[in-house]
């Protein structure tokens, strides 16, 4: 059995990390594991296992005939059985299946705005879903949506899992050791960094030595500009630091004391699982399937989204008792290692692959 993971880029986002994790994890579980990135390469290319077959299409437009031909020929030459398409790459995968009807197509839905599914564009997805052999959804809301909206019978919920990357530390965080709060999230509106900044500004009134560290891709857009403007306007330049995309996230988290997610909407965020693997005490908004990871107060703090005061209080609570915070972090680490493991997820994936190809 030969399987190709299809993804739009290898920038350090959640769906991209999942595609790389699957390609790497399946190397010794199936006959051959491949990854194709369609539009762009990125930081995560360096994390691919040397035994993963790799293709970069450099696709320039939605229907790029040259890219379609290259992928079609690659799949033919390598005798690939399954395309596992992540996110918006479903369209290209569908075109390839039309050219090779015997090919099996699995779509992985990573949609990050699961709180706002009513506004999700679905016409093209609905059309293409007729050609899907299976859909994996990253949270239960997306699973229900796929079952009721799309034209495919086989749908299942598959939680994300995180793996520690072994990249050497290259990013030295600013601030005082033991007083760092980290937010691992690309600079997108649904991540609601502005709410976090407002809450952290209030924290600084009583805890001026603490610092906030934002790690994630900067798209240099209006949202990004609003974050920098807030920092400058409120004179937070010596307390809040922005690093952009980083390949050494596991090493970065080892330098931090508290992990935070302030999102308005999520699927099942990889950042939450990465915080857990690092043993960090975590504060997260109660969106998507975050409550499946943090089930009670022993495992972290779940707060309402867009609630600055609740976020401020949660940060101050951990800061006021770091010993208890460390215990909470250890409980979450145990939970993530046992309930969101790589081994159990890959076993489910391989079983599904075997089912659709038999």
Where in this protein do the model-derived segments appear?
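A conserved, positively charged/aromatic
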Residues: 106-134, 149-150
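Conserved donor-binding/catalytic core segment of Leloir-type glycosyltransferases
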Residues: 4-6, 174-191, 197-200, 213
